[in-house]
Design a protein with these regions (language model features):
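Internal active-site segments that recognize and position negatively charged phosphoryl groups
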Residues: 39-77
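Structured adenosyl-cofactor binding patch, chiefly the S-adenosyl-L-methionine
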Residues: 26, 60-64, 75-91, 148-187
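Short beta->alpha connector loops at strand-helix junctions that form conserved
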Residues: 7-8, 46, 72-73, 95, ...
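Active-site/ligand-binding-proximal alpha/beta "capping" segment
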Residues: 116-166, 170
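Histidine/lysine/aspartate-rich catalytic loop segments that bind and position anionic ligands
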Residues: 67-110, 114
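Arg/Lys-rich RNA-binding interfaces used to dock onto structured RNA substrates
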Residues: 1-51
Length: 187
C-alpha cells in the first residue's frame, strides 16, 4: 500500500526543484548500496562542496571501475538535484559511502589499502610513479585542498604533473585524472 496525501501548491513548489511542478510528488527511502567484499580502488572526496563536482566524480568513478567513492568532511549533499543531474544515473550504480575520517581509516585498514592525498606540496610525488593499485586517493575541496588532519593520515602524497604556470585543476577533473591512473594501473 502507498500512502497518499494532498498538499497545497506552495508546499509542492517548495519540495520540487523544478520551476513548474509536474503535479504528483513522492518520497522514497533510498536503499543503501552494498560495498564489494574486498576494496581495491577507492576515491575519497573531502569537503568537495560543489554538487556538480561530486556528481561528476561519481559518474567518472562508475565509468572507470572504482569500487567505491567515499565522501568525508562536509561534501555536497549526495542527493541534491545538481549532484544527481551531474552523476547522470551513475548514482544508482556506483557505491558511495559517507563517513568520518576515523571510519575512513578503519575501512582502508580493513581492506589493506594505502591512502594517498592529492596535494600541491613539495612532498608530493608524480602520480605516475606511485603504485595506485590497490590504493585509495583523496581529493580535497576546491578552495582549500585536503585538510591537515587527512594529509597526516595519508601514506603518501601525489601530484598531477602540469605545465609550468598552471595553478591547479578543478576537483572533478583532478579526480578524473587520478581515477584514470588507478584504472590503468589495475588493468
Amino acid at each position: 500500500k502507498v500512502a497518499q496525501y494532498t498538499a497545497d501548491a506552495e508546499l509542492v513548489e517548495y519540495a520540487s526543484p523544478l520551476m513548474h511542478s509536474p503535479g504528483p510528488v513522492f518520497t522514497v527511502r533510498i536503499p543503501e548500496m552494498c560495498l564489494r567484499e574486498r576494496l581495491r580502488h577507492v576515491i575519497v572526496l573531502e569537503g568537495v562542496q560543489d554538487p556538480g563536482n561530486v556528481g561528476t566524480v561519481i559518474r567518472t568513478a562508475n565509468a572507470l571501475g572504482m569500487d567505491t567513492v567515499v565522501l568525508t568532511g562536509a561534501c555536497a549533499d549526495l542527493y541534491s538535484p545538481k549532484t544527481v543531474r551531474a552523476a547522470m544515473g551513475a548514482l544508482f550504480r556506483q557505491p558511495v559511502l559517507t563517513c568520518t575520517q576515523d571510519e575512513l581509516v578503519q575501512l582502508l585498514n580493513a581492506n589493506g589499502l594505502k591512502l594517498y592525498g592529492a596535494a600541491l606540496t613539495d612532498a608530493a610525488q608524480d602520480l605516475r610513479r606511485v603504485p595506485l593499485s590497490p590504493a585509495a586517493v583523496a581529493i580535497g575541496s576546491e578552495g582549500r585542498g585536503l585538510s591537515a588532519q587527512l594529509l597526516a593520515q595519508c601514506d603518501g602524497q601525489i601530484i598531477i604533473p602540469m605545465q609550468p604556470g598552471a595553478e591547479s585543476l578543478n576537483a572533478a577533473v583532478a579526480a578524473a585524472v587520478v581515477m584514470w591512473e588507478i584504472a590503468r594501473a589495475g588493468m
